[in-house]
């Protein structure tokens, strides 16, 4: 029996395959595409290394009515198994972009092939920078009042990782897209901006949840409240003098590096300007010398030319004495 999934690792080839599947089947529509995920489960870490699309249809008016081709799935899995016997069905993917009512039934269908399938929602048209995958697993939840058990999706961490061969391929694909003029500092600032934006979104979600609990709209979940308390306890006290001093020192160091970089860039540009100016002056001097040289005139035949003419006449017999009659 496989270990219960705690996190997922999605490879870039899977993302490319899903985007290709979506562009071929459901581009410019409101439909989504569904497929199977292949990989391995290593102590709860699900490594998704391959995938393939499945014929899938669902009724737009009634999302609970859907169709998935089982025979196609089993035939495809048998062919993939011949290529790589280590890859097993670990779950399924959907282009979402959110959880839909039929997802619980589809997830139960994939339990035939793996005890704990993961559902990965892949956003094929992300509006924000970041990881375009969200992973979920189903957990059983018991209602304290009715003692009835229900299944619900629980979010688990998701990341993008690649092996060496995949990294080389991705670098070739992004070679014409990547702008080499972007400095590492700009990249770091962009990454920090994205991280802060995600942090703000998570804080707003926690605030909204706590407000609903205080208003009595939602029942308090002590596990979630405990997680929020741990996050608050781990947050630093920004009002402390040491942290303010550290921020000031870091900011001063960063500004010093930026200032020195600008100065070096200016000095190099000035040096190149001087070199170009010197080269232009040398070129102008050479042009003046060439223009001031008088043109050559026609001269009398040289001694060498006369010698050649004499040899030619001797060859023709012009210098031989004529015979007397």
Swiss-Prot record:
Keywords: Proteasome. One of its GO terms (biological process) is proteasome-mediated ubiquitin-dependent protein catabolic process. GO terms for molecular function: metallopeptidase activity. The keyword Phosphoprotein does not apply. It holds the Pfam family MitMem_reg. Acts as a regulatory subunit of the 26S proteasome which is involved in the ATP-dependent degradation of ubiquitinated proteins. This is 26S proteasome non-ATPase regulatory subunit 7. It comes from Dictyostelium discoideum. The lineage of its organism: Eukaryota, Amoebozoa, Evosea, Eumycetozoa, Dictyostelia.
